[in-house]
C-alpha cells in the first residue's frame, strides 16, 4: 500500500513539474514575442490591429471596396 502511495505522489509531482515548466516556457515565449515587437517599433495598438486583421477570414475579392 505504501508503494502505491509513493508511486501516485511521484506521478503527481512529475505532472505538476511538467505543467509548471510548460507554463514558464509559454511566459518566456510571450516575453520574447513582446521584445521582438518592441524592436520593430510598432505600438501595442498597431500590433493589436495587425493581429485582428490577420485573424479575419479572407473573403471574396471585391474591387469596389
UniProtKB/Swiss-Prot annotation:
The keyword Secreted applies. The modification Alanine amide is found at residue 58. Residues 25-34, 59-65 form a propeptide. Expressed by the venom gland. GO terms for cellular component: extracellular region. Keywords: Amidation, Secreted, Signal. Helical wheel projections predict no hydrophobic face, suggesting a non-amphipathic peptide. Does not show antifungal activity. This is Peptide ToAcP.
Amino acid at each position: 500500500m505504501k508503494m502505491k502511495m509513493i508511486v501516485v505522489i511521484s506521478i503527481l509531482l512529475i505532472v505538476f513539474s511538467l505543467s509548471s515548466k510548460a507554463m514558464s516556457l509559454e511566459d518566456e515565449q510571450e516575453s520574447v514575442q513582446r521584445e521582438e515587437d518592441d524592436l520593430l517599433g510598432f505600438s501595442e495598438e498597431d500590433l493589436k490591429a495587425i493581429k485582428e486583421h490577420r485573424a479575419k477570414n479572407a473573403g471574396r475579392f471585391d474591387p469596389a471596396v
